[in-house]
Swiss-Prot record:
Cofactor(s) in the UniProt record: Zn(2+)
Domain of life (superkingdom): Bacteria
GO cellular component terms, A-Z: cytoplasm
Protein name per Swiss-Prot or TrEMBL: Endoribonuclease YbeY
Pfam families per UniProt: YbeY
Signal peptide: none
Enzyme class: hydrolase
EC code(s) of this entry: 3.1.-.-
Organismal lineage: Bacteria, Bacillati, Chloroflexota, Chloroflexia, Chloroflexales
The keyword Lipoprotein appears for this protein: no
Residues annotated for Zn(2+) binding in this entry: 118, 122, 128
Amino acid sequence: MIYTIEVQLDEGITADSELVERAAAAVLAAEQMPEGCEVGIRITTDDELHRLNRDFRGVDAPTDVLSFADDGHDSRFVVAPDQPRYLGDIAISYQRVLAQAAEYGHSPARELAYLTVHGVLHLLGYDHEQGPAEAARMRTREEEIMTILGLPRE
């Protein structure tokens, strides 16, 4: 499947953008999303995730990943049915990637891929904050996709 995944690395961040693209595409393929879906992913800093978390969720604290799904209900724009489907944007804190990789005892690459998978699943409607059953469903799907990527839990 062919998807459009735009990865933006903020200044000074040396994350593996190809891994991010691969991880996002793996989720979209595993979830059988139609070709042409679009996702934007920004790898940024703790400070920026803190600001976004505060401004958009009302939580005055840094976090590792945020997803901003496009619900498709913006009536200002009309999109032809044959146009690509824009799913939304994800922001990932690279500082959290490094810290959590060390904390959990795995590679920064695995953590970066995991947060990407987690964020894309949120764009597709998965939400671990909706209770234990949904959290378990999301975690299972994350691990299935991480295995597909060759980055299973160590």
